[in-house]
UniProtKB/Swiss-Prot annotation:
Catalytic activity: apo-[ACP] + CoA = holo-[ACP] + adenosine 3',5'-bisphosphate + H(+)
GO biological process: fatty acid biosynthetic process
UniProt-recorded name of the protein: Holo-[acyl-carrier-protein] synthase
Protein source organism: Rickettsia rickettsii (strain Sheila Smith)
Named cofactor requirement(s): Mg(2+)
Cited SUPFAM superfamilies: 4'-phosphopantetheinyl transferase
Gene that encodes it: acpS
Keywords: Cytoplasm, Fatty acid biosynthesis, Fatty acid metabolism, Lipid biosynthesis, Lipid metabolism, Magnesium, Metal-binding, Transferase
Enzyme Commission number(s): 2.7.8.7
Protein family membership: Belongs to the P-Pant transferase superfamily. AcpS family.
Record-level Gene Ontology MF annotations: holo-[acyl-carrier-protein] synthase activity; magnesium ion binding
Length: 131
């Protein structure tokens, strides 16, 4: 059963400006500890695109849950990782989402400077039969 769909688009140049002003603060506000480890391994040239994609992904996932960031789900509640083939994997830890468990999140990310986009689909793991 479909729970929701969310999308977000981010100007990478906007993130570059924020990083110039607040190089570490912004990353620590948006990224979880697992994501910060990945971020630290990147060259600075890739930081803005990485952060822009994570920002867009977290916004898209929160919208798919029907709430948006700060309305039951925060940036630190959502972790975006990648499998061995590069496919984005989403981990969510929030009291808001506990009532929806179990669920699957499908996420697609794309970037082509100066923008990146994220598209999320959330479905319940239960099959609901309506009569």
């Amino acid at each position: 059963m479909l729970i929701g769909v969310g999308t977000d688009i981010v100007q990478i140049s906007r993130i570059e400006k924020i990083l110039h002003l607040y190089p570490e603060l912004f990353a620590k506000k948006i990224l979880t500890s697992k994501e910060l480890k990945q971020f630290a391994l990147l060259g600075k040239i890739n930081h803005a695109a990485f952060l822009a994609k994570r920002f867009a992904a977290k916004e898209a996932v929160s919208k798919a849950f029907g709430v948006g960031i700060g309305q039951g789900i925060n940036f630190k509640d959502i972790t975006i990782l990648n499998n061995d083939l590069g496919k984005p994997i989403v981990e969510v830890s929030s009291n808001y989402t506990n009532k929806l468990s179990p669920f699957n999140i499908h996420l697609s990310l794309a970037d082509d400077y100066p923008v990146c986009v994220a598209f999320a689909v959330i479905e319940s793991s239960y099959n609901v039969i309506r009569g």
